[in-house]
């Protein structure tokens, strides 16, 4: 395995670790509605950071975006909005299926859809079937799916042991939402694929290869922001017991604390895709769709490890922790299989 591929896998791991940790600051926010908290974090992660970093990277910000016609920008934006729909459904999936089953099904579906649909769309799925490296990377995808399933099972055992139940368990509704979430969340993978002309244009301007994907985030995350912020603002305006005015009528120190914590959560959310771009840049071009598989499987891996570090599994017993450990090992094996496949 080459150093470039190894570093690509490593940066995807760092990005996934940030994704697994980003909600921790949000949990410290007090006396705010979820909608206000999510909006403040989202404004930082989907608007302020992408625009600021792109302005720093590009020699002429407006000229860069002005060179693309609508046929290039619209698919990138719409795939970003597609991801935004999946993001909203993610929380609803947890409500009706519970954390472990919801995450397992949604992540499993988005891993498969986001990874395998891209080569199908590009018309090069035969690379996966008819080359040795392609078959090995395909094997890695399915091994990762097994690892996600094992970690999901560990979570179910933990929830059963600790008496944790879904907020409003509804199998039919939950499964439907999990499928919608899984499919629509893959929009981020499709957006990165559609944004290749933007990446190439950034490279032509002399932007470092590690950073060429970052300017496209202005458009991708703009689509996601439209859906997420629109959802939050509509709820804040329509739902009786929600009020942004009330949220900002708290004591000044608490408001400042909540803003800073929400902004930190937004920063950590953004960093997952900052390092995703670094990892993506190191993956061989013919296998660039494997970035999504690495990100999502490492997200599950890091989520389990973060849970152990934060002692969320302390009272779960030995068996759930053993099953979790097995799932994490399987995901690590899957990443190595994919890495070897890309190198062959």
Swiss-Prot record:
Alphabetically ordered keywords of this record: Cell inner membrane, Cell membrane, Membrane, Sugar transport, Symport, Transmembrane, Transmembrane helix, Transport
Localization per Swiss-Prot or TrEMBL: Cell inner membrane
Major site of localization recorded for this protein: membrane
Cited InterPro entries: L-rhamnose-proton_sym_RhaT (IPR004673)
GO CC terms in record: plasma membrane
Catalytic activities: L-rhamnopyranose(in) + H(+)(in) = L-rhamnopyranose(out) + H(+)(out)
One Pfam family of this chain: RhaT
Transmembrane segments: 4-24, 38-58, 68-88, 101-121, 137-157, 175-195, 214-234, 259-279, 290-310, 321-341
Membrane topology field: Multi-pass membrane protein
Gene Ontology molecular functions: rhamnose transmembrane transporter activity; symporter activity
Similarity annotation: Belongs to the L-rhamnose transporter (TC 2.A.7.6) family.
Functional note: Uptake of L-rhamnose across the cytoplasmic membrane with the concomitant transport of protons into the cell (symport system).
Descriptive protein name: L-rhamnose-proton symporter
Primary gene name: rhaT
């Amino acid at each position: 395995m080459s150093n470039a591929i190894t570093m690509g896998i490593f940066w995807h791991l760092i990005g996934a670790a940030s994704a697994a940790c980003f909600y921790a600051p949000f949990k410290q926010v007090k006396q705010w509605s979820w909608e206000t908290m999510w909006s403040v974090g989202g404004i930082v992660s989907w608007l302020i950071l992408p625009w600021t970093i792109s302005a720093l990277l590009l020699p002429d910000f407006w000229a860069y975006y002005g060179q693309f016609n609508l046929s290039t920008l619209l698919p990138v934006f719409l795939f970003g909005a597609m991801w935004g729909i999946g993001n909203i459904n993610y929380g609803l999936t947890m409500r009706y299926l519970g954390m472990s089953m919801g995450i397992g099904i949604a992540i499993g579906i988005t891993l498969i859809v986001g990874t395998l649909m891209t080569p199908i769309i590009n018309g090069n799925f035969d690379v996966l079937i008819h080359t040795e490296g392609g078959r090995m990377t395909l094997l890695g995808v399915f091994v990762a799916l097994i690892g996600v399933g094992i970690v999901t099972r560990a979570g179910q055992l933990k929830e059963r042991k600790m008496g944790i139940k879904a907020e409003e368990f509804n199998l039919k509704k939950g499964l439907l939402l999990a499928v919608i979430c899984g499919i629509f969340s893959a929009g981020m993978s499709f957006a990165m694929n559609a944004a290749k002309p933007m990446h190439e244009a950034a490279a032509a301007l002399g932007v470092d290869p590690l950073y060429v994907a970052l300017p496209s985030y202005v458009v991708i995350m703009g689509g996601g922001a439209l859906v997420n912020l629109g959802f939050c603002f509509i709820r804040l305006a329509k739902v009786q017991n929600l009020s942004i005015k009330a949220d900002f009528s708290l004591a000044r120190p608490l408001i400042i604390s909540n803003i800073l914590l929400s902004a930190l959560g937004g920063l950590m959310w953004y960093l997952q895709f900052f390092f995703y771009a670094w990892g993506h840049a190191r993956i061989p071009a013919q296998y660039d769709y494997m970035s999504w598989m690495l990100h999502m499987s490492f997200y599950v891996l890091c989520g389990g490890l973060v849970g152990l570090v934060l002692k969320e599994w302390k009272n779960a017993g030995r068996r759930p922790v053993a099953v979790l450990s097995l799932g994490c090992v399987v995901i690590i094996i899957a990443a190595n299989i994919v890495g070897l496949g890309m190198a062959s």
